[in-house]
Design a protein with these regions (language model features):
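A generic "binding-loop/recognition-motif" signal
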Residues: 71, 79-80, 118-119, 128
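Short, conserved beta-strand element in jelly-roll/cupin
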Residues: 59, 64-69, 77-97, 135-137, ...
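Short acidic-glycine-tyrosine-enriched beta hairpin
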Residues: 97-116
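Short histidine-centered beta-strand/loop micro-motifs
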Residues: 50-55, 72-78, 95, 103-104, ...
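Intrinsically disordered, low-complexity, charge-dense segments enriched in Lys/Arg
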Residues: 140-152, 158-175, 235
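Histidine-centered metal-chelating micro-motifs
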Residues: 72-74, 92, 111-112, 116-122
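A short, N-terminal "cap"/entry segment at the start of jelly-roll beta-barrel domains
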Residues: 1-58, 164-252
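A short hydrophobic beta-strand segment most commonly corresponding to one strand
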Residues: 83-85, 113, 127-146
């Protein structure tokens, strides 16, 4: 790979392009100030305005969410893995069909591997703008977001409708669902009952890794944060490691696998 090719695969923080209309809750008060970034792959954005920095997907997608204080991301579920690394700020993650099954607060450097198939949301509870990096499993990130019914209802009250084609339509700007395209069906009460309940006692020890614990495990070798034999034992189609000074040799090497470095 030449230098030109490599430069095309570098995304710098200062060049990130946010989308403020990425999801169905973009007009809902309390969620209307968040920013979505798609860095590698299109992720699960529902907006035609979303800028994708690197379109190639190596079996997973990488993005980010940026939010000011007291801004939240509404309850939703995914069909593949969703992992967050807190880049900046203080964040509360909550889960459950109504968001009240449990919660945990994460600080800078912490990692959370949210169990696939449960509803989750998160909010910035810090005092400044914060950002969390996200890794979504699969080339298509599982085919889109599954929203809790109340999120769809709240969005409709504020002019946004999600079509069954996965696209957003802003009725306050005169947009309508295209002919032959219906609204995204809401989950029924019976379907909602099929989602598992996970207590904080089950969640936190198995799906949260704290920064200083990760740093300690990176002494002399990369910390295996998410792997079959990692701190968070899982095989979601990618591995997550943390490197620090002395974790790896400075010798050149090659690998047959895709490798993404976040500095």
């Amino acid at each position: 790979m030449g230098v030109v090719d490599l430069n095309e695969r570098i995304v710098r923080y200062g060049d990130l392009v946010p989308c403020r209309t990425a999801f169905i809750d973009a007009h809902t008060p309390g969620s209307d100030r968040k920013e979505n970034f798609t860095i590698i792959g299109g992720g699960v954005s529902e907006s035609a305005d979303q800028h994708v920095h690197i379109t190639d997907t190596p079996g997973f997608n990488i993005g980010a969410a940026g939010q000011p204080p007291k801004c939240r991301n509404s309850l939703h579920a995914h069909r593949t893995a969703e992992v967050f690394f807190v880049l900046s700020g203080r964040w509360r993650f909550f889960w459950g069909a109504k968001g009240d099954d449990g919660e945990v607060v994460l600080e800078e450097g912490d990692v959370i591997n949210i169990p696939t198939g449960i509803f989750r949301g998160f909010e910035n509870i810090g005092t400044d703008y914060g950002m969390i990096m996200a890794v979504l499993g699969g080339d298509d990130s599982g085919g889109g977001v599954v929203w809790a019914p109340q999120v769809i209802e709240d969005a409709r009250d504020h002019g946004l409708v999600l079509g069954e084609n996965g696209a957003l339509y802003d009725t306050k700007r005169g947009a309508e669902l295209p002919e032959g395209v219906g609204p995204m069906p809401q989950l029924t009460a019976e379907e909602m009952k099929q989602f598992p309940k996970v207590t904080a006692a089950e969640f936190v020890p198995n799906f949260v890794a704290r920064y200083w614990d990760i740093m300690a495990m990176a002494d002399g070798a990369p910390a295996q944060v998410i792997a079959g034999d990692g701190m968070l034992a899982d095989t979601p189609g990618f591995r997550l490691e943390l490197l620090r000074d002395g974790s790896v040799s400075t010798d050149r090497y090659t690998t047959a696998r895709h490798e993404v470095l976040m500095v």
